[in-house]
Amino acid sequence: MARLSPLHLRVQCAIRQQQLLHPGQRLLVAFSGGQDSFCLLQILRDLQPRWGWQIFVLHCDHRWSADETECARFLQGWLQQQGLPHAVETADPIRRDEAGARAWRYQQLEKWARTWDCSAVVMGHTASDRAETFLWNLLRGTGAAGLSSLDWQRHLDDRDPTSAQVVRPLLGLYRWETEQFCQQHQLPVWPDRSNQDLAHGRNRLRLEVMPYLKQHFNPQLEAALNRAATLLQAEHELVVAQAAQLWPQVYEPALPGLRRDPLRAAPLALQRQVMFQFLSLVLPHHPTFEQVEAGIQLLKADRGSRSPDYPGGHWLEVKGDHLVCFH
């Protein structure tokens, strides 16, 4: 077995400490061809003899540009040359928005995780990505869940606890480290030219805003934002756990609805988490902050009071001691 570098050992330590992966697992690697995903794939391959993993690779071509399609062809050839089991998916129709592209990409990951019977989907997000996500979500407006959303692991489908785990073994590394690793190992990284397009707000944040903040406010900005995300993650997990304990006391599935008295007596943070969980069950999509707050207001409202209409023709109405969802 080849000797492991300090970077390999750091990633292996994170895998063990965070309990991300287990020996003998079948892994699906989300592979863009950029430096982070190349670094991830190489480290997993180097650790494979010690862990006995079976590694499968998926690349998604969004067809946003001719360059992206050329990248897909190049990566497919390289993966074939390496003898790695892989698939390349091409978007049809093309999803022009980030949210639509992400949803399509996750659909492909779910499909291939099932096809190859993979229990973990491994992604190459780094601490640099986590810092950017924290600041991006803060600027857009979000709570603790959004600020700490890029975590070490989560379910591929957050509504399905049986879905594969998304794991991020590189969250302890920064982007400059993955770049250095790829250079040292002469990996054929494909540069994503769209990452330089300042028309995309996320690119402007990464290329202009964060360097400015580092220069004028905090040279260790990425580390500071990662610490904040870690702290908020632990606090959010506490609220979620306490809300889970309260849930059987307030949820009435037959209605469906919530008992107002015990929920009204709970702290506001728990009220919001329970309301978010309830609305996520009855609505077609996760609720917004305003939709959660509309439900919270009804906990103290008079009988017969109702919320504004929610998506899908749903609304909440006070019926006695219950807050009931109608459709």
Curated annotation (Swiss-Prot):
Catalysis: reaction(s): cytidine(34) in tRNA(Ile2) + L-lysine + ATP = lysidine(34) in tRNA(Ile2) + AMP + diphosphate + H(+)
Give the UniProt record's GO annotations in the biological process aspect: tRNA modification
Q: Sorted alphabetically, which SUPFAM superfamilies does this protein's record hold?
A: Adenine nucleotide alpha hydrolases-like, MesJ substrate recognition domain-like
Main location as per UniProt: cytoplasm
KW NADP (keyword) present? no
According to its UniProt record, the EC number is 6.3.4.19
Residues that, per the record, bind ATP: 32-37
List the record's Gene Ontology CC terms alphabetically.
cytoplasm
Q: Which InterPro entries match?
A: Rossmann-like_a/b/a_fold, TilS/TtcA_N, tRNA_Ile_lys_synt, tRNA_Ile_lys_synt_N
| One Pfam match | ATP_bind_3
MF terms per GO, please? ATP binding; tRNA(Ile)-lysidine synthase activity
Lineage: superkingdom:
Bacteria
Question: Localized where?
Answer: Cytoplasm
Q: Which UniProt keywords apply?
A: ATP-binding, Cytoplasm, Ligase, Nucleotide-binding, tRNA processing
Its family remark reads: Belongs to the tRNA(Ile)-lysidine synthase family.
Q: What is known of its domains?
A: The N-terminal region contains the highly conserved SGGXDS motif, predicted to be a P-loop motif involved in ATP binding.
Q: What does this protein do?
A: Ligates lysine onto the cytidine present at position 34 of the AUA codon-specific tRNA(Ile) that contains the anticodon CAU, in an ATP-dependent manner. Cytidine is converted to lysidine, thus changing the amino acid specificity of the tRNA from methionine to isoleucine.
Record's protein name: tRNA(Ile)-lysidine synthase
Q: Give the organism's phylogenetic lineage.
A: Bacteria, Bacillati, Cyanobacteriota, Cyanophyceae, Synechococcales
